[in-house]
Amino acid sequence: MVSVEELMGQVIDSEMEVISKELSKALEEALNLVKQKRDSVERTYTAKMQEMVTKAKEEIEGERARLDIEVKRAVLGEKNYWLNKVYEGTIKSLGTVKNSQGYKQGLESVLKRELRDGSIVYCSEDEVDQVQKMIKGLKAKAEVRSDPKIMGGVKIQYSDVGLVRDYSLNLILDQVFESLKPKIAEILFGEM
């Protein structure tokens, strides 16, 4: 026969074993729950960090693009400045061109070819006398007017038909300069 104490010991051992198993299960469930929560938090914050990194990259790319455009504008502005300096230098050297014999012969040739009686000839203020002498030499009846916008050459207005022919140095210089701009840019900046 088993004594009460032994029986109590067996019952206690049996209950301890059941309690131990239950505690092990509870501990395992708690660890799984903690692991799931940790994984969930990790996924959430990893996604948030990825989102923040992506947003920061987009902001950096946007700023880089803005700065690239700003640099290109600055470079283009500087190039235009130097091209305009070349143009201004060309305008300043027009005095030499206007004093040349070739220029005077060209001007007279244009008047001889294009002038009609009753025309109005516009020229620069410093060439009025010269143009009047040329017209007188051609025995044509035309009015000569100065135009402060004209740097040289002439504009001939045919009042009877409402037509103006432009042989001014302004137009010629603009056309030649525009056509030579790529070559000038290549010389100045090493570009095509």
UniProtKB/Swiss-Prot annotation:
Q: Which UniProt keywords apply?
A: ATP synthesis, Cell membrane, Hydrogen ion transport, Ion transport, Membrane, Transport
Which biological process terms from the Gene Ontology are attached to this UniProt entry?
A: proton motive force-driven plasma membrane ATP synthesis
Compartments it resides in: Cell membrane
- Repeat in keyword set: no
For this record, the Gene Ontology CC terms, alphabetical, are:
plasma membrane; proton-transporting two-sector ATPase complex, catalytic domain
Q: Which Gene3D superfamilies match?
A: ATP synthase, E subunit, C-terminal
Superkingdom to which the source organism belongs? Archaea
Q: Which GO terms describe its molecular function?
A: ATP binding; proton-transporting ATP synthase activity, rotational mechanism; proton-transporting ATPase activity, rotational mechanism
Identify its membrane topology class: Peripheral membrane protein
This protein's record includes keyword Nucleus = no
The cross-references to HAMAP family, in alphabetical order and at most eight, read: ATP_synth_E_arch
Q: Which family does it belong to?
A: Belongs to the V-ATPase E subunit family.
Q: Subunit composition?
A: Has multiple subunits with at least A(3), B(3), C, D, E, F, H, I and proteolipid K(x).
Give the function comment from the record: Component of the A-type ATP synthase that produces ATP from ADP in the presence of a proton gradient across the membrane.
**Protein known as:** A-type ATP synthase subunit E
Q: What is the species listed in this Swiss-Prot or TrEMBL entry? A: Metallosphaera sedula (strain ATCC 51363 / DSM 5348 / JCM 9185 / NBRC 15509 / TH2)
Q: Which gene encodes it?
A: atpE
